[in-house]
């Protein structure tokens, strides 16, 4: 009897166990299946010998240093605004973008320089499309002064040249920009031109590249049929709208007549002719941007590495002043950054959602326009520092204490004397203000003191003795005298107090004399009386001679009338000492005043035409008569439902001489016609 073998367990590791190896031929067959070729074998083209198609050129671009001659190739020039192209007979040097070129000289080039205007001007092989053949049919050149017939079919509408003023003739042979523009436009003409293009969908869009070279021809294409070209700017180019308007007028030759946000209205000129326009060659491809200096340095000038690191850490904790939207209008961004620098030395702008290149272009523009120093572009934010040599753009405060203190620079004994005189006058003014706020003064005593004030020991002096006050308050250094009338200005209230008739030599000490001083000092003019006196004075303009006692007499008269009529309440010193009594009397006095305004002398409207009836009344009477003559309506109540139902009584006979308008039915109208 055969017994089964017991399974033996191996104590070797899997790497030490021996496995049978297959032959090499079998291994190849299992791992790699041999498949016949499906198609003919493709042959590679022979590699060209031109450097433009080499592997190095197709890979990572090498930095080509710029020669010292400033002309790397024929017609190509490296300037402080990038790379420019110069052609014979051109009015200016061409650039790919006239507004978005960085204001820095390139450090190196990324490709060999060439002229991007076509095969004739390009030293490299032509890689673009084959140019279209010229048309055999010679089309007449478009002339703006020779318009097509108005009823001709298949012709787009064309605006005529102009507008021309009365007596003005068009200039056909206009060459210069001033001759093409003609006379300046009036406000009515500008509003009419803008209104005609405001809702037009035919516009030129300007994006992150700004005003490019090929847009010049597009603007002339718009001017071919319309007087105004509407340009809509969005994105990075809107930061410096003034530069865009300047470049448009300089390169194209028109006139910006209106600008609102990112929309520009460019007028072609009164004598513009499309046939005599300047023709520019088109750029057939975009040149590669050169290498510019780094925008952000690790350690900005004037800082240590630790200070720069601490400033970046502190700047990332600041809230951003604004968030820029994609394809938005950033015309106010420069002013916002400048205002923010008035409050803090670091400013952060949120650029989340924008392209990385747009964020860096915005930072480069702010660096030149604000100006400022860029610290970081991390976390899609622009972090800026105002710099160590920053100066505030706000004007200094003229009324501040520091400015006044700087202006008051005196020397020697003269300064001490001036300060003494000014101190005396200021003490008098403080005494006047304290006396005016004194509550306890009697009406009879005030009248007596006013009558006797001319005989008191207060001798009035001119303002010649106190010139220091005029110097310290910033008033003109001309010293007024008592003979010259004082000029009053609401912006300079010190002139009211410093009347030549109000300056005192001695300061009274008792209470009665202080009240007299108060009454005498209240002769300051108010705006209404001064205006009335200016109108009466025909000899002088802007000067007013102050009267002494007219205003105080009128004030006392009004106060006396108020007391007699019960509209004013006078309390004695004993009554003022008790606060409860003052409260009770004030409450009782408040309740005694009528709640509504009482007008004693009210004007009554006199009816000049009493016998003539009013037109409105006649119209209303006529409407009432028509309503009475209309068909009556009876309200019948349903007992079950309880709701009212309106029914018309048709059994009533109509009057034969009354014709109702819009109230007859068909059967009733037939009865009347029969």
From Swiss-Prot:
Which InterPro entries does the UniProt record give?
CAF1P_plant, RNA-binding_CRM, YhbY-like_sf
CRM domain location: 183-279, 301-397
| A Gene Ontology term for the protein's cellular component | ribonucleoprotein complex
SMART domains in the record: CRS1_YhbY
Chief place where the protein resides = plastid
Single annotated GO MF: RNA binding
Q: Where in the cell is it found?
A: Plastid, Chloroplast stroma
Q: Where is this region: Disordered?
A: 31-61
Q: Where are the compositionally biased (Low complexity) regions?
A: 48-57
Matching SUPFAM superfamilies: YhbY-like
What are the GO BP annotations of this UniProt entry?
A: Group II intron splicing; mRNA processing
What span is annotated as transit peptide?
1-54
Positions of the UniProt region annotated as CRS2 binding: 554-576
- Give the record's keywords alphabetically: Chloroplast, mRNA processing, mRNA splicing, Plastid, Repeat, Ribonucleoprotein, RNA-binding, Transit peptide
Q: Describe its assembly.
A: Interacts with CRS2 and RNA. Part of large ribonucleo-protein complexes that include group IIB introns, CRS2 and CAF1.
State the protein's purpose. Answer: Required for the splicing of group IIB introns in chloroplasts. Forms splicing particles with CRS2. Interacts with RNA and confers intron specificity of the splicing particles.
Q: What is this protein called?
A: CRS2-associated factor 1, chloroplastic
Lineage of the organism: Eukaryota, Viridiplantae, Streptophyta, Embryophyta, Tracheophyta
Gene name in the database record? CAF1
């Amino acid at each position: 009897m055969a017994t089964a073998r017991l399974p033996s367990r191996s104590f070797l590791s899997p790497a030490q166990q021996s496995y049978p190896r297959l032959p090499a031929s079998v291994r190849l067959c299992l791992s790699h299946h041999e498949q016949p070729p499906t198609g003919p074998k493709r042959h590679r083209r022979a590699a060209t010998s031109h450097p433009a198609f080499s592997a190095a050129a197709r890979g990572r671009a090498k930095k080509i240093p710029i020669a010292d001659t400033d002309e790397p190739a024929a017609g190509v020039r490296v300037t402080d605004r990038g790379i420019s192209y110069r052609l014979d007979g051109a009015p200016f040097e061409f650039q790919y973008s006239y507004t978005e070129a960085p204001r820095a000289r390139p450090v190196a080039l990324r490709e060999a320089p060439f002229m991007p205007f076509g095969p004739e001007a390009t030293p490299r092989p032509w890689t673009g499309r084959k140019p279209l053949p010229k048309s055999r049919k010679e089309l007449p050149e478009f002339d703006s002064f020779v318009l097509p017939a108005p009823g001709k079919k298949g012709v787009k509408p064309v605006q005529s040249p102009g507008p021309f003023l009365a007596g003005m003739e068009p200039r056909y042979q206009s060459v210069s920009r001033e001759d093409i523009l003609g006379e300046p436009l009036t406000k009515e003409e500008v509003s009419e031109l803008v209104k005609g293009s405001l809702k037009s969908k035919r516009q030129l869009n300007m994006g992150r590249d700004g005003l490019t070279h090929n847009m010049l021809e597009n603007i002339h294409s718009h001017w071919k049929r319309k007087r105004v070209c509407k340009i809509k700017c969005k994105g990075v180019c809107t930061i410096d709208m003034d530069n865009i308007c300047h470049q448009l007028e300089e390169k194209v030759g028109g006139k910006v007549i209106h600008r609102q946000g990112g929309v520009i209205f460019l007028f072609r000129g009164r004598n513009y002719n499309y046939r005599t326009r300047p023709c520019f060659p088109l750029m057939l491809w975009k040149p590669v941007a050169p290498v510019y200096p780094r925008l952000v340095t690790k350690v900005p000038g004037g800082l240590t590495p630790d200070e720069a690191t601490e400033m970046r850490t502190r700047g990332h904790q600041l809230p951003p002043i604004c968030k820029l939207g994609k394809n938005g209008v950033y015309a106010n961004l420069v002013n916002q950054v400048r205002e923010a620098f008035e409050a803090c030395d670091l400013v952060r702008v949120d650029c989340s959602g924008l392209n990385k290149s747009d964020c860096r272009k915005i930072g480069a523009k702010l660096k030149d326009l604000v100006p400022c120093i860029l610290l970081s572009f991390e976390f899609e934010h622009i972090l800026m520092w105002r710099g160590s040599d920053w100066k505030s753009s706000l004007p200094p405060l003229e009324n501040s204490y520091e400015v006044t203190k700087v202006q008051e620079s005196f020397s020697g004994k003269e300064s001490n004397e001036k300060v003494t005189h000014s101190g005396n006058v200021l003490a008098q003014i403080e005494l006047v203000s304290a006396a005016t706020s004194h509550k306890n003064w009697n009406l009879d005593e005030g009248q007596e003191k006013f009558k006797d004030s001319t005989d008191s020991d207060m001798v009035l002096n001119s303002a010649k003795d106190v010139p220091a006050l005029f110097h310290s308050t910033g008033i003109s250094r001309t010293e007024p005298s008592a003979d010259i009338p004082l000029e009053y200005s609401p912006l300079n209230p010190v002139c009211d107090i410093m009347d030549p008739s109000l300056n005192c030599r001695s300061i009274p000490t008792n209470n009665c004399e202080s009240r007299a001083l108060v009454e005498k000092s209240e002769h300051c003019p108010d705006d209404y009386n001064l205006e009335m006196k200016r109108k009466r004075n025909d000899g002088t303009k802007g000067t007013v001679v102050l009267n002494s006692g007219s205003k105080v007499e009128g004030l006392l008269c009004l106060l006396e009338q108020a007391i007699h009529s019960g509209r004013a309440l006078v309390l004695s010193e004993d009554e003022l000492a008790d606060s409860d009594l003052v409260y009770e009397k004030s409450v009782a006095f408040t309740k005694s005043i009528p709640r509504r305004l009482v007008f004693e002398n009210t004007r009554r409207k006199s009816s000049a035409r009493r016998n003539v009836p009013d037109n409105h009344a006649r119209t209303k009477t006529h409407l009432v008569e028509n309503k009475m003559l209309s068909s009556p309506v009876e309200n019948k109540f349903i007992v079950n439902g309880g709701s009212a139902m309106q029914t018309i009584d048709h059994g009533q006979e109509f009057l034969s001489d009354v014709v109702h308008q819009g109230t007859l039915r068909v059967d009733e109208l037939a009865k009347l016609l029969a």
